[in-house]
């Protein structure tokens, strides 16, 4: 049986929205570079210079003899760096980078990025830019099928997204715990509803925001489990959730991310499942890559968050991450 509990909107009123990147163009049709700064935290970190940076741009033919042919729109997550430079200066240097893009394959289709330009202000992000990086193609490109192999490709930066990491603490969630299952446990999940306003250009206004499209995504927080062979009631789980004092925000980690902070009391078992962290981050890049690509430049805001209490998936249920389900005939063997 599934039980759903609605959070009060005050839990995300302050930081529950992200402004759009409104596209503007030069007279020749090229996009004007822009930077967007997001701060999903409460500002209690003493050092305010840490930030997560992503670059958005166009994957295009690297042909010096003619006008470049744009193939797809992409994102290059640079990760966390520490800098006191102004966002506009960071953007200027990013637009001057010579970033080569190559399409390849491993377990799935990949995109390889590497930069050939010396770095100054972007030195804190040199690990990704100078040594190269490989990403799941569907996570960082909206149309990887359009990228050719016989023509050199480059990534031309047009937008920059900066997320200030102003919260005191760490943001990671132990990945193994996200798949953890337990007998007689109640799974605590969140169903988040976003209202999306795609960047449609300057001067264009949608009068009725209720007509804007909505999308949902779901994240797993942890499990409530009793020591004895009994199951907590839904009402008891709701009480434990209310005591946690959860506050929600939207950030730009990997595109769009859900940030959660517990300001109250958390059960010892759940606290351990979360790696003894009370500041959490769930990037949509990992949770729902299709929705994440849709939100790269869009305005979005949280309109509803619900706690979903469900029986933990039985341990005898196997999780199939592969399309091939092996049988007793041995037709598909792992080499």
From Swiss-Prot:
It comes from the Viruses. Coiled coil: none annotated. Signal peptide: none annotated. InterPro entries: Matrix_C, Matrix_N, Matrix_Paramyxo_C, Matrix_Paramyxo_N. It is found in: Virion; Host cell membrane. One of its GO terms (cellular component) is host cell plasma membrane. Keywords: Host cell membrane, Host membrane, Host-virus interaction, Lipid-binding, Membrane, Viral envelope protein, Viral matrix protein, Virion. Pfam families: Matrix_Paramyxo_C (PF23765), Matrix_Paramyxo_N (PF00661). One of its GO terms (biological process) is fusion of virus membrane with host plasma membrane. One of its GO terms (molecular function) is lipid binding. Homodimer. Dimerization is critical for virion formation. Interacts with host ANP32B. The M protein has a crucial role in virus assembly and interacts with the RNP complex as well as with the viral membrane. Associates with phosphatidylserine (PS) and phosphatidylinositol 4,5-bisphosphate (PIP2) at the plasma membrane. Interaction with PIP2 triggers matrix protein lattice polymerization. Matrix proteins induce host membrane deformation and curvature necessary for virion assembly/budding. Belongs to the morbillivirus/respirovirus/rubulavirus M protein family. This is Matrix protein. It comes from Measles virus (strain Edmonston-AIK-C vaccine) (MeV).
């Amino acid at each position: 049986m599934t039980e759903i509990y609605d959070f009060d909107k005050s839990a995300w009123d302050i930081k529950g929205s992200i402004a759009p990147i409104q596209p503007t163009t030069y007279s020749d049709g090229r996009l004007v570079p822009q930077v967007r700064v997001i701060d999903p935290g409460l500002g209690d970190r003493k050092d305010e210079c840490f930030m997560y940076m992503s670059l958005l741009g166009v994957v295009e033919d690297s042909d010096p003899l003619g006008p470049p042919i744009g193939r797809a729109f992409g994102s290059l997550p640079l990760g966390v760096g520490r800098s006191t430079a102004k966002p506009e200066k960071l953007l200027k240097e990013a637009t001057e980078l010579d970033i080569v893009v190559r399409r390849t394959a491993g377990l799935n289709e990949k995109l390889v990025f590497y930069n050939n330009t010396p770095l100054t202000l972007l030195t804190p992000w040199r690990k990704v830019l100078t040594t190269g990086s490989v990403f799941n193609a569907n996570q960082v490109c909206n149309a990887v099928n359009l990228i050719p192999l016989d023509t050199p490709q480059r990534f031309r930066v047009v937008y920059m997204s900066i997320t200030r990491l102003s919260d005191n603490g760490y943001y990671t969630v132990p990945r193994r715990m996200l798949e953890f299952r337990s007998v007689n446990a109640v799974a605590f999940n969140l169903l988040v509803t976003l209202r999306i306003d795609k960047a449609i250009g300057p001067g264009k206004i949608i009068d009725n925001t209720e007509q804007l499209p909505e999308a949902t995504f779901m994240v797993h927080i942890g499990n409530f489990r009793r020591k004895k062979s009994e199951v907590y009631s839904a009402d008891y789980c709701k009480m434990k959730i209310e005591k946690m004092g959860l506050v929600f925000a939207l950030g730009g980690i990997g595109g769009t991310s859900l940030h959660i902070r517990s300001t109250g009391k958390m059960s010892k078992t759940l606290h351990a499942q979360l790696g003894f962290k009370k500041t959490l981050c769930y990037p949509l890049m990992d949770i729902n890559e299709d929705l994440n690509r849709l939100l790269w430049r869009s305005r979005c805001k949280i309109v509803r968050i619900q706690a979903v209490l469900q029986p933990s998936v039985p341990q005898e249920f196997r999780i199939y991450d592969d399309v091939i389900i092996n049988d007793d005939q041995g037709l598909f063997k792992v080499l």
